[in-house]
């Protein structure tokens, strides 16, 4: 037999993120200047607040944060993958057995990971002079975890976050900001959305196939193929109640003040069977005549279930 082993490792990172302003003083001054350029008579951030913020940054990172949200929410991901295979045989039978494992830690700092187990088996045998049989079976089991609002929404929240938005107090309270910004009266905290809930998915797939070939008299060939596919897909969403706090007053604001859980399950089985009789003959050197008849049978059984609870 021949044995093959392989291992692969990789580091992942965001290939590109926007070059945003992370200095809160620069951000507030630039926003004010943009509003004046538009012809507005008043600006968002008054001078006293900007001066207070600039001085406060020297003493209190919670009330006067300078949040770089790309640095806070992204990390280097890590990927590892292992595979093993054994193969061999004789002139009448051959076999191949393989298995693999993959583990991936995503580039977001929480609820961003995946895991996969895979395996396969193939056997081909010349049972008699006329009969040939092949069997194959393969499957995989996958797990992955995503942020509760989904990857695209979470990335959008990170992109929109401002450097004046707070992160988290040592006691676990998620912060917002004491400054008022038009259109951001209930500001998102990207770290809160990454940590306070997730979607966990499990996907299991099995594929099996049996091939039979038999040479009948008079040059007639019989072929049969039986296939089986089973899929199980399970998903669970869970979201905590989300609150943010004014870092100055500790006034609580309801961002998403409910707890919810949702389970979703889907099961499907697919059967296929087809068989053929074929005959062919060559004549005249460059002429071929072929005839084939066959039948096919397919069956699909599926069911799904979903339940949701919200408090």
Identify the residue ranges that each predicted region occupies.
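Surface-exposed loop/interface segments of Gram-negative outer-membrane beta-barrel transport/assembly proteins
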Residues: 4-65, 107-207, 223-225, 229-311
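Outer-membrane beta-barrel initiation region
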Residues: 74-76, 86-90
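Short, surface-exposed loop/turn segments at beta-strand-coil junctions that are enriched for proline
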Residues: 213, 217, 280-282
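Short coil-to-beta-strand
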Residues: 91-96, 246
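A beta-strand signature from Gram-negative outer-membrane beta-barrel systems
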Residues: 1-6, 79-81, 94, 100
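Ligand-site clamp/hinge motif
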Residues: 102-104
